[in-house]
UniProtKB/Swiss-Prot annotation:
Protein name: Interferon alpha-A
Organism: Bos taurus (Bovine)
Record keywords: Antiviral defense, Cytokine, Disulfide bond, Secreted, Signal
Pfam families: Interferon
CDD domains in alphabetical order: IFab
GO cellular component, one term: extracellular space
Taxonomic classification: Eukaryota, Metazoa, Chordata, Craniata, Vertebrata
């Protein structure tokens, strides 16, 4: 899982750097929304991560699949949008653990939906300026495959509480990195 984590960190660094340098500036509230998503994801935890160590998995989120350093800055916001969209869909599935607090899950979905709205506004503005979609097909396919692997993993594990804990932790690390990096770039500006 270490290679996946390091790649996610690299991707989010590129994404946050790009977001800070695009003509479309996401409001400070976007960083606060990331923190809210993190808080809600943390509150959803019902299983001790240490009891799920045998269920950990490497979801193969490869740097080459998304173009790595080849990813243009303007495309990073598209990647972030696609990741947020798939996260929303993942946590909207019927297989969500019954042990999760429904009101927390609803709040998480609402927070993700607000982020999608903010990101979509930036995408629309950037695509209008450039006249073409920002996300390369390879990047889009890599994100879809990654989330497909998460979904298959949940199905293979029959949506067990430990499987959801592994997926929840994977998503939480991504949002944590995103929040920290956005704030560090904001301080530099």
């Amino acid at each position: 899982m270490a290679p996946a984590w390091s790649f996610l960190l690299s991707l989010l660094l590129l994404s946050c750097n790009a977001i800070c340098s695009l003509g479309c500036h996401l409001p400070h509230t976007h960083s606060l929304a990331n923190r809210r998503v993190l808080m809600l994801l943390q509150q959803l935890r019902r299983v001790s991560p240490s009891s799920c160590l045998q269920d950990r998995n490497d979801f193969e989120f490869l740097q080459e699949a998304l173009g790595g350093s080849q990813l243009q800055k303007a495309q990073a916001i598209s990647v972030l949008h696609e990741v947020t969209q798939h996260t929303f869909q993942l946590f909207s599935t019927e297989g969500s653990p019954a042990t999760w607090d429904k009101s927390l899950l609803d709040k998480l979905r609402a927070a993700l939906d607000q982020q999608l709205t903010d990101l979509q506004a930036c995408l629309t503005q950037e695509e209008g300026l450039r006249g073409a979609p920002l996300l390369k097909e390879d990047s889009s396919l890599a994100v879809r495959k990654y989330f497909h692997r998460l979904t298959l993993y949940l199905q293979e594990k029959r949506h067990s509480p430990c499987a959801w804990e592994v997926v929840r932790a994977e998503v939480m690390r991504a949002f944590s990195s995103s929040t920290n990096l956005q704030e560090s770039f904001r301080r530099k500006d």
